Amino acid sequence: MKLSLSPPPYADAPVVVLISGLGGSGSYWLPQLAVLDQEYQVVCYDQRGTGNNPDTLAEDYSIAQMAAELHQALVAAGIERYAVIGHALGALVGMQLALDYPASVTVLVSVNGWLRINAHTRRCFQVREQLLHSGGAQAWVEAQPLFLYPADWMAARAPRLEAEDALALAHFQGKNNLLRRLNALKRADFSRHADRIRCPVQIICASDDLLVPSACSSELHAALPDSQKMVMRYGGHACNVTAPETFNALLLNGLASLLHHREAAL
């Protein structure tokens, strides 16, 4: 699996791995790259079955497989210890990495994540699946911003959204791969295992997230033994894109604090 690695800003700089959500594209993290590159060696990638890592996914594809293939790619690149920043599905992959490779994951950041899928989130995906089946990739892509962004943010950026739709349609991961990745997301349940995650965790959520209620992050915070939660008042599901200055400040401060906490505990 292909990874994109930034040059380390200094010798032995900590490594940060960015894991996007269901879309799978590493470019989702573009608003964070410039600030993270100054302090960390940053790893981005398109998830298997998407972008520049094309593949046909098995029907039983799982979050555990997503975690294993990423860890193997990191080890092959000479990276054995790393912090993880995951958005939605990416946060699930991050938790799986923390469970399966505890010696490797130094810190986990969960952005609009959850322990197990909420009934409201499931309903949103059911509607989106119906759109995919009835209207194809174009209907899926055109509906997606409604679940990602606040209404006023979208209304002020109509040309940008049109360009994003065209790009997403041109690089659509394929119906079968999308549904198999979505099914992996829906099957994931960390409610009985979260207390085994021992690395420090930063939880960031947006109170106006339409897709994933912020209560999901509260449940995550209660279940994780070493976690702290930050709530953004504005930003929607893709709050790192719509409110990058607020998000980046929370992320950088949290990462630095938790990495220091981790090193002090060793």
Curated annotation (Swiss-Prot):
Family: Belongs to the AB hydrolase superfamily. Hydrolase RutD family.
Recorded catalytic activity of this chain's protein: carbamate + 2 H(+) = NH4(+) + CO2
Pfam family, one: Abhydrolase_1
Top enzyme category: hydrolase
Keywords, in A-Z order: Hydrolase
InterPro entries noted in UniProt: AB_hydrolase_1, AB_hydrolase_fold, AB_hydrolase_sf, Pyrimidine_utilisation_RutD
Role, per record: Involved in pyrimidine catabolism. May facilitate the hydrolysis of carbamate, a reaction that can also occur spontaneously.
Organism listed in the record: Escherichia coli O81 (strain ED1a)
Official protein name in the record: Putative carbamate hydrolase RutD
GO terms of biological process kind: nitrogen utilization; uracil catabolic process
Keyword Hydrolase set for record: yes
E.C. designation(s): 3.5.1.-
